């Protein structure tokens, strides 16, 4: 149920609950990205209504709109393509999905309404009203209009973070990330599109951290210079493991090495050695720090990262 933020150089930087938030708002950058928490079973759908219809929406308007095929998902290839953003018109560079950027005022004005299915099964209507003066303004309510909340999230409260978080369940903001410059990898459950939306346990890299996957290779002798690094955050992802239903055990893909270029500019060799699954949530891996020429700077070391318990590194 936790999310661990990990520095290749300095180990775990934070290990926090991954079920206490519903929305995440981009703090740095210009995409005005807004994520939903699929790990917490939060589901997002377009309402198919104008913002002028906000007060007139009823439960009848949800009929046919909450089908699984209509679900909007965070993209697991980039932090900056959230569920609220993926309906953007690619032909309009000012369309950010939930709203449109005004070049004159430098504000984003919300032009879309959404239905959100909460982990409790409740249905909320959601309107991201604007982003102006570094503050997100948004509203949510029951679909019949009751229990409406109009609130804000200020970027200034989350300086140095990728995202600021909000819980609809408690009506509060959450500061749950370490500084964006202090971590390289996130270990957690997240939603992946697959052929259909599915919750996976895997590893996502931080923004500007590149990863190269080498497979099939000799794990001892492989050179990093033969493989092209990628900035897709799911390059490590979840497919380095698979569950064997015959033995009821997790199998780790052999002959697989990941080369991680971290926030500090160092290159690391990472080999996964185990996964605890639902038993303990542990990600087990071997890491080796490389110099700019690919020569080992220090001895390789095994690492045990627990998404639920604390990690231990030898």
Residue ranges of model-derived segments:
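Surface-exposed, beta-sheet-biased, low-hydrophobicity segments with strongly acidic/polar composition
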Residues: 1-292
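Surface-exposed, proline-anchored Ser/Thr-rich loop/turn motifs
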Residues: 296-314
């Amino acid at each position: 149920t936790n999310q661990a933020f990990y520095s290749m150089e300095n180990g775990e930087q934070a290990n926090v609950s991954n079920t206490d938030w519903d929305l995440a708002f981009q703090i740095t950058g210009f995409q005005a990205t807004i994520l939903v928490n699929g790990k917490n079973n939060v589901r997002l759908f377009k309402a198919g209504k104008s913002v002028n219809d906000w007060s007139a929406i009823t439960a009848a308007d949800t009929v046919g709109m909450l089908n699984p095929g209509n679900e909007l998902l965070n993209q697991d290839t980039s932090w900056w393509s959230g569920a609220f953003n993926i309906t953007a018109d690619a032909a309009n560079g000012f369309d950010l999905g939930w709203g449109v950027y005004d070049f004159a005022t430098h504000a984003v004005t919300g032009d879309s309404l959404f239905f959100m299915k909460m982990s409790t099964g409740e249905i909320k209507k959601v309107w991201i009203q604007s982003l102006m003066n570094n503050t997100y303004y948004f509203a949510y309510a029951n679909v019949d209009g009751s229990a409406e909340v109009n609130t804000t999230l200020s970027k200034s409260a989350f300086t140095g973070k990728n995202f600021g978080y909000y819980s609809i369940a408690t009506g509060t903001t959450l500061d749950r990330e370490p500084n964006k410059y202090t971590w390289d990898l996130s270990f957690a459950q997240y939603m992946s599109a697959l052929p259909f939306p599915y919750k996976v346990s895997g590893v996502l890299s931080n923004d500007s951290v590149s990863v190269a996957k080498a497979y099939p290779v000799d794990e001892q002798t492989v050179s990093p210079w033969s493989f092209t690094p990628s900035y897709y955050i799911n390059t490590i992802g979840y497919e380095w493991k698979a569950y064997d239903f015959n033995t009821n055990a997790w199998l780790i893909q052999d002959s697989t090495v990941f080369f991680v270029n971290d926030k500090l500019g160092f290159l690391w060799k990472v080999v996964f050695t185990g996964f605890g699954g639902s038993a303990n949530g542990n990600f087990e891996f071997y890491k080796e720090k490389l110099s700019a020429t690919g020569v080992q700077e220090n001895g390789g070391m095994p690492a045990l990262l627990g998404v639920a318990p604390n990690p231990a590194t030898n």
